[in-house]
């Protein structure tokens, strides 16, 4: 069995896939398997995957119908044989000796965060090198995570899976998977679910991963109210596991924001009122008005909304709960 499994979802990435795979195959550490999940590519990507698999006996290809990156990653998780798991996007690449560095870390660590560099389409490179932190026990794990996301530069560091090392036994034992019909912040939800079972976390400043900010990545996808509602519910499921107040407040803010985003996109009055009721019950259950929560950011969110829409929400709450 290999020490490391590398899961790579592939979709129409023929332009960069070779660089991605070559950066892995050139590593000094070679006790790994590569799982290429071809997510219904319509270009040459699928054939390129097959070519590499025919040349290297540690590369496995799975051709799937197009179901999205989360489904592709889940397929990979089901097939992993390694003790550790990393995710790599098919248009990105690893630094030289990245795997040797990661696999040389302490063997009892459950989750590793590492540094990365962002490469923009105009050639600019931004380095993300978080402070070194070794956290023992779930309380310290929570502290390490909140220290990252309260840092303005690293607030979105939970929102990626390609900057982390996971243990396959935790993924399998607790059936941790990506939510397949969620295409917004699904990586963060996955990480929060996983981290609950971690007893040791390492945050490393070393640059290991190169992330390509593509043209398509710069285009904002329009999300439906169903997605925002699903995301709000997913955060609520994670919330029950965490005891750190700052981390709880962070998740509560995400829950409220996503409820508001869902409500804003619902045209059906009855359905909208149902969600407003759900949000109001959440407010009351969590005693949000009595918390030292950074609720001001939610108020700022509300104040940025069109005044007519804000008044509509306000009047709906008054009518529903009078």
Regions found by a protein language model. Give the residues of each.
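Acidic helix N-cap motif at the loop->helix transition within catalytic regions
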Residues: 16-18, 43-52, 93-97
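Membrane-interface aromatic/basic loop that binds lipid-linked glycans or pyrophosphate carriers
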Residues: 267-322
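Glycine-rich, basic loop-to-helix element that forms the pyrophosphate-binding segment
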Residues: 64-80
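Catalytic core of nucleotide-sugar-dependent glycosyltransferases
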Residues: 206-214, 220-249, 265, 269-287
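N-proximal low-complexity "stem/linker" segments adjacent to membrane-targeting elements
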Residues: 1-25
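Short aromatic/hydrophobic "clamp" motif used to bind/position activated sugar donors
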Residues: 85
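Donor-binding/catalytic cores of nucleotide-activated saccharide
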Residues: 69, 90-201, 209-226
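A conserved acidic beta->alpha catalytic loop
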Residues: 23, 38-48, 65, 89
